[in-house]
Amino acid sequence: MPNRTAPATPSLISLLLLVTACGGSDDAPPSAVVAVPLSCAEMAGRTVPADQIGLPTTGARVTAAVTVAPSGSGAAARPEHCLVSGEIAPVDPTAPSIRFNLALPTVWNQKALMLGGGGLDGTVPNVVGNVSAGPTDQPLPIGRGYAVFGSDSGHQAGPLASLDASFGLNDEALHNYNSGDALKKTRDVAMLLIQARYGQKPVRSYFSGGSTGGREALTAIQRWPADWDGAIAWYPARAGMVSILGGHRMSRALAQPGAYPNAAKREALFKSAVQTCDAFDGVSDGIIGHQDRCNAVFDPSTALVDGAPLRCPGGADTGDTCLSDAQITAMKVINTPTNLNYLASGETQHPGYNIWGADTGIYTWNTPVQPTVNFLAFNRSAPVLPMPADAPYISIYTDQWIKYHVTRDPGYNSLSLDPENPGAWASRISFLSTTLDAKTDLSGFAARGGRLLMAHGLNDVLVSSRSTRAYYNTLVSQMGLQGLRGFARYYEVPGYNHAASSVFNATWDSLTTLENWVEKATVPGEQITRDTVGVPGRTRPMCEYPKWPQYKGSGDVNAAASFACVN
């Protein structure tokens, strides 16, 4: 492990800095790159010229630099650090700046970590927080000594927060988000500021993100492989345009008359799938461990729940304990692929969602994370225009996307656009796919010795785990299984939804796993994930796809050691 380093601060350095600052025009701001380390206070006002940034900008500046005292305790402890805030100016004067934060610990481990965003971005990630699905019993990245940074991807969200797509009316802002240009700009500025603070560049640089942040991780290592030693991508929205179109098909299905199931009906569907499929992995524990078999055999039209038919009598909507034919039809649409044969990115379909056994928003569950699950799933209201604030997350997302990124008409009826046959909008959607759907060529990253960890919950109804499988399978077809496993791993987690789950709320020390692979050549095998909500403290193996966890027939059902990863 690299030695921990504290910035040098002798009086001679202060004198040299003063000479450096006075060496040019009185009106010229000081450069971020200096020969000796800067104090936190001296970081304020530093600038980075445009020619030091790998993509076009008009330069960057530090708007604030504040020393933050230590706080917290145990794994959640945050050491003393310099919190730097700044802006990267656009080329287009009408475009928004990229805002970023950079946490620089006083005692540095000589490594850097970039955090990805979420949804449509628009806010800066918490640079003193954890990685996606990070462990609760291990130090935070800042606590490990990392210099941690992230940006809002080049626009500032309004009241809709991560669902605000209005930035798409500006081409530069849209490109910063879609193609990941903001990632490169932010990274280059951060590296120079880290060098200014410590007098050297990082020995190692990693990227971690989930959802949109997972897509950003994959984009970063694909477009700029030389910049990164390793990356962690949780539930990545990798084929962004495909994910949006598949999600929009789901939204349109739920918008059909009588198709949206209320929370009680969603709970009935969940119970029916669990009662049908739970034991497929060898133990009935509330987790569907063999999701593929469940997908193959479960049919809501014929399934039972608590011994009674899940389908309402005659298919009519007769109450909260059953699903009508309209609701069953919508669920089956969500389960099936969306055909997309017109995209210039080369993607041809969205594979559908593992809806059978997924928590799509169960309001009787009183856990700390359930409000997040409900918000990210079907929420409280059916999709309709104008889109309700409590509509499904994906419905608000796709409504915004279509209005501001595709048609650029805020008054457009988004539900009228058929994602499989978009008519006049096909060319625009196809064009957007060329930047939003992350490329699959990771040969440059593999050649430079980079390492990639991917993971996805099998009950994610926002970003489909089937899409991550498709990405992995494409990589296998391009590089061969042996070539891919030389630098990448993909794990699946039964019971885990998108970023949160009351069934199995997965945590994993992915950062240590990545560090050990990159820095110690410790090749990762099966991993252990710990539940913090469903049964707090229970563990399961994280099986490398295509394996799944099967109970061995004896032993503690809440211990990973009682399960084997099998094909």
What is each residue range found by the language model?
Residues 487-501, 533-534:
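Histidine-bearing beta->alpha loop at or near hydrolase active sites
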Residues 200-211:
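Alpha/beta-hydrolase fold nucleophile elbow
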Residues 25-111, 124-129, 134-136, 284-288, ...:
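Catalytic-loop region of hydrolases
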Residues 119-199, 245-246, 408-426, 431-434, ...:
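Cap/lid segment of the alpha/beta-hydrolase catalytic domain
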Residues 219-221, 226-341:
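A catalytic-pocket lid/entrance helix-loop region that shapes and gates access to the active site
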Residues 18-21:
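C-terminal motif of bacterial Sec signal peptides marking the signal peptidase cleavage site
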Residues 454-456:
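Short beta-strand/loop motif that positions the catalytic acidic residue
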Residues 209-219:
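Glycine-rich nucleophile elbow surrounding the catalytic serine of serine-hydrolase chemistry
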